[in-house]
Every structure is written in structure tokens, then in C-alpha cells.
Amino acid sequence: MGKLELLQCLTGHRGRAWGAGWHPKGNVLATCGEDKTIRIWAEDASQRWVAKTVLSDGHSRTIRDVAWSPCGQYLASASFDATVAIWDKKSGEFECNATLEGHENEVKSVSWSKSGSLLATCSRDKSVWVWEVAQEDEYECAAVLNTHTQDVKKVEWHPHEDILASASYDNTIKLYKEDLADSDWSSFDTLVSHESTVWSISFDGSGNRLASCSDDQTVKIWQEYKPGNEFGVSCPDNTPVWKCVCTLAGYHSRSVYDISWCKQSGLLATACGDDMVRIFKEVEGSSPHEPTFEMVGSKHAHSQDVNTVEWNPTVVGLLVTTSDDGDVKLWKYEPEE
């Protein structure tokens, strides 16, 4: 087994710590929580992470999620007040320069597309919204997708294409894309296998695979099959299909709330209601179409539910967790020699 070492505990949030988002360069971290604030952390001269800024005037209720744009210039925050705020530092200090309104109640997740020209949000109102970045500080709704039958927990863009995935309380994952002929967004696949709420999803670096985690205490790996694939998987309407190729069961004793697929190492990290963080590695030589994963690390990480886990995009082995206990923790994973 590898080693998960606690590097630092970042304190300051009051109440639950919910979301965490690494800046694309990996040198800045944004976190948010029940205290209606966003904290921006960076390393000081002694390489300790410190809170550089606290943003407290953007939302009137819990902030559930934060995400940096791919260019690193903008930070989006999703709140239970039904809005999404867009922050930037153009003036030298962080300011909220746009507020996206339209959801009927709590916004649970926000995600930027790879190009940075699209933003996705999802809510307890069962809808997924796609927003176009029209011009500076202007965002236009490009689509309202009402395909889920329950609360939508998570949205995540494909790492290379304008394909969007969403996870829901209705136990399914939906995939969406735009019909370029008529600019209409629609769902082209529904991934069904989980037996309870799907809390979170994460694409691998290639975008050909998706990991999901659920209230059913499992993690599932989904593989994309394109039309004309050599595995004989049929693709109706000449559209790629996604199939569950692996289920990780028996590792988690409570709901699995978040999952992060490291784009550099290929390692999976999970955040669980049993207060644990676990690391999984694909077994070398296993078939991508029937992969096997093994647990290569685990840690009792917090004193309450772990809400978020996210690998740093540039520093291999560095990850952040947030918890109901109010703490944000930084960890270093060292594989077994």
C-alpha cells in the first residue's frame, strides 16, 4: 500500500467545508462552505498554505462548489441561494462581476468547458443549464436541460470535447452535446447501473472513461465505445455509447460523495461518508474493457463526512479534501516503492 501523508490542515471555514477547486496552475486553491464564504489559499515564502483572501459578499446562503476557468482568470461559485457568481481579479482584487440567475433553488455544482467558452450548472430543481460566455462579464443561457427526474448533484465537462456529463439523485448519469446544425443541446446517453444517488463523476485524462461514485457505496468505471469499434458494441444512430466495465464494491462502508481521476498518474481518489479517503490504481496489464482496480491507499481523513476530494492538476500526488468537520486538508500520496 502507498502512503497518504497529511501535509497541512487549513482552518478558517465555520460549519461544513463543501467545495474545493485548484487553479489550473496548481498554485492557488479556492474552498467554500456553509459560512457563505470562499477562501483563496496560496503558499507563503515558507511553503505553508495561507488564506490570501476571503470572499464573503457574493452569496446569501451556503456555497456548495467552486471552479476556476481553464485560463485561470475567473472563479465560479455555486450556492444554495440559487445563483452562480463569477469572480475575477481584473481590478487587482477579487470582485464578483457577474451573477447567473435562473435556477429555482440550490445550485449544487459548476464546471467550465475545456475552451472556457461554456459553463455548466446544475440544481435541486432537476435541471442542468449550459451558459455561453458571450463577452467580458456577460453570460447567456444556451440551454436548459430537464432530462433528470430528481435533484442533479454534479456536472463535469469532458477534458477535450464539448461533451457534458451530469449525475443525479435519480441514480443515473446523463451525457449531453450540442447539435451543431441547429445549436440545440440534448442528452445522447443515459448511464444506468447505480442503485442509488450518483453523487459525483470524473473523466480520466483521455476523456474515453468516466468514473462515478454513489450512495450505493460503489464506484463504477464507464468506457466510451465509438461507432465501428472493434469490440462489437453497437452504436445506434452512429452515436458513441458508454458502458459500465468495472464496479468497485466492498471498499466503502458509507455513501461515496466524491471522486477524482488524476489526469497525470491515472489514480482514482474517493471521498466517503465513513470519514475516509481511498486511493485506487488500475492493475497493470488489465484490459481497458474489463479493467481491474486495486486499493493502494486509505486514510481516516476527517472526523466527519468527507465531501470533496481533488487531485492537484500540476503536482503529482497532491490532493485536497473538505469535510463536514469544517477542515480543508492537503495530502501527499506516495506510491509503494
Swiss-Prot record:
Q: Which SUPFAM superfamilies match?
A: WD40 repeat-like (SSF50978)
Q: Which Pfam families does the UniProt record give?
A: WD40
Q: Cellular component per GO?
A: cytosolic [4Fe-4S] assembly targeting complex
Positions of disulphide bridges: none
Q: Does the keyword NAD apply?
A: no
Matching entries from SMART domains are given as: WD40
Entry's Gene Ontology BP terms: iron-sulfur cluster assembly; protein maturation
Keyword NAD carried by entry: no
Q: Where is the signal peptide?
A: none
Instruction: Mark the WD repeats by their residue spans.
Output: 12-51, 58-97, 102-141, 147-186, 193-232, 251-290, 301-337
**Keywords (A to Z) from UniProt:** Repeat, WD repeat
- What's this protein's function? Essential component of the cytosolic iron-sulfur (Fe/S) protein assembly machinery. Required for the maturation of extramitochondrial Fe/S proteins.
- Give the family, as the similarity comment puts it: Belongs to the WD repeat CIA1 family.
Protein's recorded name: Probable cytosolic iron-sulfur protein assembly protein Ciao1
Native species of this protein?
A: Aedes aegypti (Yellowfever mosquito)
